[in-house]
């Protein structure tokens, strides 16, 4: 009975709180400049969110303090850039110009 007497704007403000807005969905079919994105947590679970950049998947980093020493060392080694193998081409220079002097015509 009391809600019927209040104006419509006051009734809407009464329903908005930080708890309900975090739990409910967006009530718009198109939300400007936010893109559907999947967040993958370190344990493999996923969460669907809206993100300001057009990305499909965001993978959160793993906490290294929870790993064993061997796993931590293996992950840190995988992060380091790989060294490029330099290929040295050996050119055999056994060209002898005197061998071809007979083919040159003198004028």
Swiss-Prot record:
Top-level division of the source organism's lineage: Eukaryota
Keyword vocabulary terms for this entry: Developmental protein, Mitochondrion, Ribonucleoprotein, Ribosomal protein, Transit peptide
InterPro entries (alphabetical): Ribosomal_mL55, Ribosomal_mL55_sf
Single Gene Ontology BP annotation: translation
Tissues/organs with expression: Ubiquitously expressed (at protein level).
Pfam families (alphabetical): Mitoc_L55
Gene Ontology MF, one: structural constituent of ribosome
GO cellular component labels: mitochondrial large ribosomal subunit; mitochondrion
Family that this chain belongs to: Belongs to the mitochondrion-specific ribosomal protein mL55 family.
Function according to Swiss-Prot or TrEMBL: Involved in mitochondrial biogenesis and G2/M phase cell cycle progression.
Protein's recorded name: Large ribosomal subunit protein mL55
Organism: Drosophila melanogaster
């Amino acid at each position: 009975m009391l809600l019927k007497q209040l104006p419509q704007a006051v009734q809407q403000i009464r329903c908005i709180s930080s708890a309900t807005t975090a739990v409910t969905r967006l009530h718009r079919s198109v939300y400007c400049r936010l893109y559907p994105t999947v967040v993958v947590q370190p344990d493999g679970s996923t969460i669907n969110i809206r993100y300001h950049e057009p990305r499909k998947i965001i993978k959160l980093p793993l906490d290294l303090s929870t790993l064993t020493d061997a796993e931590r060392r293996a992950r840190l080694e995988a992060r380091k850039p790989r060294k490029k193998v330099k290929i040295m081409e050996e050119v055999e220079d056994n060209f002898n110009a005197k061998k071809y002097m007979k083919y040159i015509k003198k004028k």
